[in-house]
Amino acid sequence: MPNFLPINTILVPQGAEYKAVCRAFRGVTGSIPTVVAIPVGMKPLLKYLHASPANAQFLAPKSRVLIMGICGSLSDRYKIGDLVLYQDCVYQGKQQECDRTFTAQLHSSVSQKVSLVKALTSDHLIWSAAEKRRLGETLAADVVDMEGFTALEFFNAAGVDVAILRVVSDDCQHNIPDLTPAINDGSLNPLPLAIGMLRQPLAATRLIRGSLTALKVLEQVTNLLFSG
């Protein structure tokens, strides 16, 4: 692990994203950060952060938290599999910035192509390509997620250095399935998820392919950062 950017904790949305990051550490020797699975969505994440038994570790002096995962593109510039590093995150007119020094160090550590972006955090799943393009244009945002702003607001208030590194899993040219009914209290419920996928098979196929591509890149970049 590069000693000049000691990362204490990696937070990753639970499920496939968390598993991809954990796979990246197989065979990695030396000091590795604690990888923590977090709930999906703003409200479940905020509740988790305030109640988590790992709070003492998150908020320790000089601790650094890296948030990883996948995201959706709001711009034609960012394609499936692209690696993005957040500069800041917006939500309903409010803005939270990532730590500039930490972000710059990560940027120089990732030898493969990585783009510095402005992110939007949404309190609901944005499945429509038209809505993605509209949000990208009106808010001048590049990508969208469902956790970034909440995490930044929490850790910035506590004085913890935070950076966010994500991989694009869906573009702004095609709809993805509306899986809103499947998201419940921070997790994906299998039955509504399956029903949502079956109702929109073409969109589901695109989402699965995009997610698999993004998860592979997520695993690769995690291994790259921490394998020395």
Question: Which role fits each region the language model picked out?
Answer:
Residues 1-111, 119, 142, 157:
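Metabolite-binding pocket within alpha/beta catalytic cores that recognizes anionic/polar moieties
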Residues 16, 40, 44, 97, ...:
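Conserved active-site and cofactor/substrate-binding residues in soluble primary-metabolism enzymes
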Residues 22, 50, 107, 149-152, ...:
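Predominant activation on well-ordered alpha-helical scaffold segments within soluble catalytic domains
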Residues 24, 82-84, 131, 194-198:
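Short, basic/glycine-rich phosphate-binding loops at helix/coil junctions
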Residues 48-55, 105-113, 125-126, 158-164, ...:
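Noncatalytic linker/hinge segments flanking ATPase motor cores
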Residues 72, 81, 87, 123-124, ...:
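Flexible, active-site-adjacent loop/turn segments at secondary-structure boundaries
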Residues 100-173, 177-181:
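Active-site rim beta-loop-alpha module in soluble metabolic enzymes
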Residues 168-228:
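Regulatory input/activation interfaces that engage signals or partners
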